[in-house]
UniProtKB/Swiss-Prot annotation:
Induction: Expression of this operon predominates when carbon dioxide is limiting.
Gene: cbbL
Quaternary structure (record): Heterohexadecamer of 8 large chains and 8 small chains.
Binding-site positions, Mg(2+): 203, 205-206
Cofactor binding remark: Binds 1 Mg(2+) ion per subunit.
Similarity-based family: Belongs to the RuBisCO large chain family. Type I subfamily.
Keyword check for Coiled coil: no
Keyword field: Calvin cycle, Carbon dioxide fixation, Lyase, Magnesium, Metal-binding, Monooxygenase, Oxidoreductase, Photosynthesis
Active site: 177 (proton acceptor), 295 (proton acceptor)
Function: RuBisCO catalyzes two reactions: the carboxylation of D-ribulose 1,5-bisphosphate, the primary event in carbon dioxide fixation, as well as the oxidative fragmentation of the pentose substrate. Both reactions occur simultaneously and in competition at the same active site.
GO molecular function: magnesium ion binding; monooxygenase activity; ribulose-bisphosphate carboxylase activity
Annotated protein name in UniProt: Ribulose bisphosphate carboxylase large chain
Cofactor(s) annotated in UniProt: Mg(2+)
Note: The basic functional RuBisCO is composed of a large chain homodimer in a 'head-to-tail' conformation. In form I RuBisCO this homodimer is arranged in a barrel-like tetramer with the small subunits forming a tetrameric 'cap' on each end of the 'barrel'.
Lineage: Bacteria, Pseudomonadati, Pseudomonadota, Alphaproteobacteria, Rhodobacterales
């Protein structure tokens, strides 16, 4: 071999040094995304003096194959395929200095069926990148070929309704309060009262695990005694979300097996356990015919601010792939952050077989879920019977409405609080099915029902005027057009 000739060819193909990301091929304004590409929409805030196109190219580069300098080993790979490509940059409406940048990733960059691998690329590095003041992942689109590598929810909405034999209306639940401090026996008493009064589910809260005042095994035993007694007395299938979140997967599996042995139909985990753990426990639930409830504990640390972090609609998409049956998605009218249209977008991501572009609700891409099962959204946090017409109008039937304080704080007791919520729901569903305008007539419908139900009357007298009217920090930004109507 002619060494000299080889060296010359090497120099022609490779030159050491630092190039702009756009020059390295991470920007292509003419690129047309393929059906098999993974697409991501970032909201970026470049540092002063940084060109938005270069910033977008940097996001594409640092979330795929690039590093800060040219490396000769690029020539050992199919660079043109492996490079992510920023293909569109546009100013965020009404927000100077911020830009939407669209990035396409070849499917070959991702391991099949692994949220951990997906997130390591998409959010693993770019959010600390110095040329950006801030960055937020607003939305994603997954090709059908990629969606098919995931198993999705172990039970799904249809399977859960068939198992519970409950159709045509939302499910009702409540979180046991206070979150911490009750003994196992008193905890079970709360669960029994709520279920006996008319709720479908009671639940553990995110931070009740196994503390000195109540060991997890005691809680499970007393809770399932309450569930079985309430089920026998009402003739309805009842349940309680037993939180199996623990410090290790081995301990989580141990708690899940014990819950199953007691006859529980559902277990719960917190988002903070991580995506690998979530996918692992989802697989266990699939194998053991259990419903998996997901509490989104901790999400607000990175989903709430508009300029930096991850939109919850993306988290919802990841969790549908990962395989949860229930997911807390906000209430819009309760105590927690949530613009009504934006929250409806989260629900649509969970429940629809195909998402169309819906800019007012923050959905920027079409998404075909390829027959992946649907996730049941959960509305929880500061809601009460007086808001039943708003909740039913906003979210429809496929939702779990959880009234924690609105059940356990009832002036006539826990069972009365549950009855108030059940009567309010039944009255509102009946009125809706009769063709009445529940948005307008809701308060009147509730008061009419309260004439025959003292617990509902007491609930309306106690909380009827309670609202949480704060401006949402996370709303959708888009340019209104004739085809994008509010």
């Amino acid at each position: 071999m002619d060494t000299k000739t080889t060296e010359i060819k090497g120099k022609e193909r490779y030159k050491a040094g630092v190039l702009k990301y756009a020059q390295m091929g991470y920007w292509d304004g003419d690129y047309v995304p393929k059906d098999t590409d993974v697409l991501a929409l970032f909201r970026i805030t470049p540092q002063e003096g940084v060109d938005p196109v270069e910033a977008a190219a940097a996001v594409a580069g640092e979330s795929s194959t690039a590093t800060w300098t040219v490396v000769w080993t690029d020539r050992l790979t199919a660079c043109d395929s492996y490079r992510a490509k920023a293909y569109r940059v546009e100013p965020v409406p009404g927000t100077p200095g911020q830009y939407f940048c669209y990035v396409a990733y070849d499917l070959i960059l991702f391991e099949e069926g692994s949220i951990a691998n997906l997130t390591a690329s998409i959010i693993g590095n770019v959010f600390s990148f110095k040329p950006l003041k801030a960055a937020r992942l607003e939305d994603m689109r997954f090709p059908v070929a990629y969606v098919k590598t995931y198993k999705g929810p172990p039970t799904g909405i249809v399977g859960e309704r068939e198992r519970l034999d409950k159709f045509g209306k939302p499910l009702l639940g409540a979180t046991t309060k206070p979150k911490l401090g009750l003994s196992g026996k008193n905890y079970g008493r709360v669960v029994y009262e709520g279920l006996k009064g008319g709720l479908d589910f009671m639940k553990d809260d995110e931070n009740i695990n196994s503390q000195p005042f109540m060991h997890w095994r005691d809680r499970f035993l007393y809770v399932m005694e309450a569930v079985n007694l309430a089920s026998a007395q009402t003739g309805e299938v009842k349940g309680h979300y037993l939180n199996i979140t623990a410090g290790t997967m081995e301990e989580m599996y141990r708690r899940a097996e014990f819950a199953k042995s007691l006859g529980s139909v559902i277990v719960m985990v917190d988002l903070i356990i991580g995506y690998t753990a979530i996918q692992s426990i989802s697989e266990w639930c699939r194998q053991n015919d259990m419903i998996l409830h997901m509490h989104r504990a901790g999400h607000g640390t990175y989903t709430r601010q508009k300029n930096h972090g991850i939109s919850f609609r993306v988290i919802a998409k990841w969790l549908r792939l990962a395989g949860v049956d229930h997911l807390h998605c906000g209430t819009a009218v309760g105590k927690l952050e949530g613009d009504p249209l934006t929250v409806q977008g989260y629900y649509n991501v969970c429940r629809e077989p195909f998402n169309t572009v819906d800019l007012p609700r923050g959905i920027f891409f079409e998404q075909d879920w390829a027959d992946l099962r649907k996730v049941m959204p959960v509305a929880s946090g500061g809601i009460h019977a007086g808001q039943m017409h708003q909740l039913l109008s906003l979210f429809g039937d496929d939702v779990v409405l959880q009234f924690g304080g609105g059940t356990i704080g009832h002036p006539m007791g826990i069972q009365a609080g549950a009855t108030a919520n059940r009567v309010a729901l039944e009255a509102m569903v009946l009125a809706r099915n009769e063709g009445r305008n529940i948005d307008v007539e809701g308060p009147e419908i509730l008061r009419a029902a309260a004439k025959w139900c003292k617990p509902l009357e007491a609930a309306l007298d106690t909380w009827g005027n309670i609202t949480f009217n704060y401006t949402s920090t996370d709303t959708s930004d888009f340019v209104p057009t004739a085809s994008v109507a509010m």
